Swiss-Prot record:
Signal peptide: none annotated. PANTHER family: ATP-DEPENDENT CLP PROTEASE ATP-BINDING SUBUNIT CLPX-LIKE, MITOCHONDRIAL, ATP-DEPENDENT CLP PROTEASE ATP-BINDING SUBUNIT CLPX-LIKE, MITOCHONDRIAL-RELATED. The gene is clpX. Disulfide bonds: none annotated. GO terms for biological process: cell division; proteolysis involved in protein catabolic process. Belongs to the ClpX chaperone family. This is ATP-dependent Clp protease ATP-binding subunit ClpX. It comes from Thermus thermophilus (strain ATCC BAA-163 / DSM 7039 / HB27).
Length: 399
């Protein structure tokens, strides 16, 4: 029996009415080149319509477990952030549900992990991320950066894929520095305070912002990239020095633990929106960051753990660099505790650890390659005399 001429199983056409036929492993099933092209176009359209958020939304427990690998302590903050970020992206996956956006305010002293938490979240979720410093921003008409430049950084990190940027995370640091100077609105414009809050308010609450692709100040004749900010998660961070006195006055306490030097493990007193308004944040701005997350000051033990425990801990980084030279590097507990003590004395928290350790290690990293030693033990005295660690290593190896 003569087989019928093959035809496209999708459009029904036969060559030469259509292009070349591609045969399926299933007998007598074909697709023509024209239908392949149409299928690719349909898939591309579907991909463009699909949300550009995380490819898979991890549960809060998974998010916190990832944060645990990089951020030491701050258990309550990590739990709260994990739930908040999960709910934010769950809301985007279900646009039919009318759930408002809940931006996040992180309160804690310098070096407690505010920026690290935001960075780690964005990296884990694989969404675009941008950091801005609120102190560099000014309202339109003043010297400084327009608030839209915050979104430009997000666009740049999304390779100018606008839809992907619109699902990103923005961390704005030093947000406490744009508090107005008094609780009562001033008759004059406060360039570094209320005006910037008002300008930021528009993009934080959700608007279509016109972003200058080259950055800098906007002018009438340049082209803009429209960016809808309604689904961008804004995480705001600040030390809010002096806020403890406002909370203390409200609750009638004489001590507070969320800023300054820690006394044992006391819990920070709860900050409420009214405290932030008294501090100098405008009510509308406070209302757009309803989740307030407080971070503990870090103690000596915390800083030692930060040096050694995270996946990318400083000690592990230095050990890997020396291992590449065939040298095993060990740090004594006494040396690590002294690094932590010096960082605490500087008042820079975890941020000061790298500077202290780098200063001590630079001479050692200069001399050790090619020295022939197999193991270096870095002890407390070597913080100020690092080359003694190399001399002692040579003596041990020779004996």
């Amino acid at each position: 029996m003569k087989r019928p001429r093959p035809h496209c199983s999708f459009c029904g056409l036969r060559p030469p009415e259509t292009g070349r036929l591609l045969e399926s492993p299933i007998e007598d099933v074909y697709i023509c080149e024209d239908c392949v092209e149409r299928a690719q176009e349909i898939l591309a359209q579907e991909e463009r319509r699909a949300p550009k958020g995380p490819s898979r939304l991890p549960r809060p427990q998974e998010i916190k477990a990832h944060l645990d690998q990089y951020v030491v302590g701050q258990e309550a903050a990590k739990r709260a952030l994990s739930v908040a970020v999960y709910n934010h992206y769950k809301r985007l996956l279900h646009p039919e549900a009318e759930i408002g956006k809940a931006n996040i305010l992180l309160i804690g002293p310098t070096g407690t992990g505010k920026t690290l938490l935001a960075e780690t979240l964005a990296r884990f979720l694989d969404v675009p991320f941008a950091i801005a410093d609120a102190t560099t921003l000014t309202e339109a008409g003043y010297v400084g950066e327009d608030v839209e430049n915050v979104l430009l950084r997000l666009l740049q990190n999304a390779d100018f894929d606008v839809e992907r940027a619109e699902m990103g995370i923005v961390y704005i640091d030093e947000i406490d520095k744009i508090a107005r100077k008094s609780e009562n609105p001033s008759l004059t414009r406060d360039v570094s305070g209320e005006g910037v809050q008002q300008a930021l308010l528009k993009i934080i609450e959700g608007t279509v912002a016109n972003v200058p692709p080259q950055g800098g100040r906007k002018h009438p004749h340049q082209e803009f990239i429209p960016v809808n900010t309604k689904n961008i998660l804004f995480i705001l961070g600040g030390a809010f020095e002096g806020l403890e006195n406002i909370v203390k006055a409200r609750v009638g306490k004489t001590t507070i633990g969320f800023t300054g030097e820690r006394r044992e493990r006391e819990e920070p007193l709860e900050v409420i929106p009214e405290d932030l308004i008294k501090f100098g944040m405008i009510p509308e701005f406070v209302g757009r960051a309803p989740l307030i997350v407080q971070l503990h000051p870090l103690g000596e033990d915390d800083l030692v753990r930060i040096l050694t425990e995270p996946k990318n801990a400083l000690v592990k980084q230095y050990q890997e660099l020396f291992r590449m030279e065939g040298i095993e590097l060990r740090f004594t507990q006494a040396a690590l505790k002294e690094v932590a003590r010096r960082a605490l004395k500087r008042g820079t928290g975890a941020r000061g650890l790298r500077a202290i350790l780098e200063k001590a290690m630079v001479d050692l990293m200069f001399e050790a390659p090619g020295s022939g030693v197999k193991e270096i033990v870095f002890d407390l005295p070597h913080l100020d005399h690092p080359l003694k660690a190399l001399e002692e290593a040579r003596l041990r190896q020779a004996s």
